[in-house]
Amino acid sequence: MADVLVSFKLLPSDSDVDTSVMESEVKEKLNGVCKINNIEEKDIGFGLKYIHLEVIVEDKEGEVDRIEKVLSMVKGVGEINTENVSLI
């Protein structure tokens, strides 16, 4: 089976959320679930930041939903946007 690269935009639930702490918890929660290809903080504007996350998963039904469910359990994550899904 092929692999899929999935990009997510993780928005904090509040402007007071420390995105570096959120990033650490994302790495911890996804350990053993999928391979993290890239994770970085990006600016929205006015001092607000979000986490851009790229993961590699198997190309099978339900994988993106499974990752979203794990990400929703991360403290401080308010919104999860799946930005791109592509075969690699």
Swiss-Prot record:
What does the function comment of this entry state?
Answer: Promotes the exchange of GDP for GTP in EF-1-alpha/GDP, thus allowing the regeneration of EF-1-alpha/GTP that could then be used to form the ternary complex EF-1-alpha/GTP/AAtRNA.
CDD domains reported in the protein's UniProt record: EF1B
Similarity annotation: Belongs to the EF-1-beta/EF-1-delta family.
**Keyword set, alphabetical order:** Elongation factor, Protein biosynthesis
Q: Could you tell me the superkingdom of the organism this chain comes from?
A: Archaea
**Which Pfam family name is an example for this entry?**
EF1_GNE
Q: What is this protein called?
A: Elongation factor 1-beta
Q: Name one GO molecular function term.
A: translation elongation factor activity
Show which residues constitute the signal peptide.
Answer: none
